[in-house]
């Protein structure tokens, strides 16, 4: 489900903004997405390397439309695995984000716009890790990669490293640098227990259907990446703020 209790953009606002687009979200597309989510939830347990490859293909390529070097034309390459981030490894050495997203187009020196950190289902995203040279939580590790990618930029570049995406391959969190770590978009494929909400992305309700639509939409290439300027998701956040200010002004003008 989409949990917006700590989100920088609300589910209600997204429902209003995407109403027409959601009407065009056919039952066939929803059924295909639901099959993919169920297939992932029921997958055999793989070693870390194989799991990351399958995870990247299932979600980043097949669901969200990013292109990798092996299967996409040069101009459509938006995904680099093991992206180097100087100064953000254990002990202050060179680190590597599990995945970086951006309009790379075959250039490894292009600015990444999303830095991703993957963990397995046994990891707690906010828990300190027992790693040699660093005890940072997965969330801290991910945001450190974003910070490292921003280091040395002058804020006048066409794009910036805007986002951090951290996941245990069941829970997904998208952090916007300006509001991290307190605010983030959060989805879970499967609830941990009955106390974790009334439904999840595998449920058959209308609320679950809309959340599946949001899951496919919000993390997509079209929402998170930009050729120049702020990406569409950030422009939606700004629109939500503007609407809130307008409503507040109307309230005080009464």
Task: Please tell me what each predicted stretch does.
Residues 58-62, 102, 121:
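Generic, well-ordered alpha-helical scaffold segments in large soluble proteins
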Residues 3-4, 8-9, 13, 59-61, ...:
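N-terminal functional modules and adjacent low-complexity/disordered segments of proteins
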Residues 34, 39-43, 90-98:
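Short N-terminal helix-initiation segments at or just after the protein's N-terminus
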Residues 41-80:
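Acidic-basic catalytic patches of nuclease active cores, encompassing PD-(D/E)XK
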Residues 47-52, 56, 92-96, 134-141:
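Phosphate/oxyanion-binding active-site loops and adjacent basic polyanion-contact surfaces
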Residues 1-41, 104-114, 118-143, 148-254:
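Short, basic/polar, glycine-containing "phosphate-handling" surface segments that engage DNA
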Residues 7-8, 69-110:
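Active-site metal-binding core of divalent-cation-utilizing nuclease and nuclease-like domains
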């Amino acid at each position: 489900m989409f949990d917006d209790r700590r989100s920088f953009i609300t589910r209600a606002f997204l429902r209003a903004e995407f109403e027409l687009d959601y009407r065009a979200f056919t039952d066939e597309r929803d059924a295909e997405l639901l099959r993919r989510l169920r297939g992932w939830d029921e997958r055999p347990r793989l070693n870390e390397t194989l799991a990351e490859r399958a995870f990247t293909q299932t979600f980043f390529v097949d669901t969200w439309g990013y292109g990798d070097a092996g299967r996409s034309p040069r101009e459509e390459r938006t995904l680099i695995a093991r992206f180097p981030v100087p100064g953000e490894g254990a002990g202050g050495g060179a680190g590597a984000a599990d995945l970086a997203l951006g309009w790379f187009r075959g250039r490894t020196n292009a600015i990444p716009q999303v830095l991703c950190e993957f963990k397995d289902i046994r990891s707690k995203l906010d828990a300190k890790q027992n790693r040699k040279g660093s005890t940072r939580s997965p969330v801290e590790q991910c945001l450190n990669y974003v910070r490292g990618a921003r280091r040395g930029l002058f804020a006048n570049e066409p794009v910036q490293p805007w986002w951090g995406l951290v996941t245990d391959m069941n829970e997904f969190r998208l952090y916007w640098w300006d509001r991290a770590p307190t605010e983030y978009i959060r989805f879970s494929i499967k609830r941990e227990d009955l106390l974790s909400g009334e439904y999840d992305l595998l449920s058959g309700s209308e609320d679950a259907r809309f959340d599946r639509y949001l899951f496919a939409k919000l993390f997509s290439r079209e929402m998170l990446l930009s050729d120049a300027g702020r990406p569409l998701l950030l422009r939606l956040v700004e629109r939500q703020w503007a609407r809130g200010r307008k409503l507040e002004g109307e309230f005080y003008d009464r």
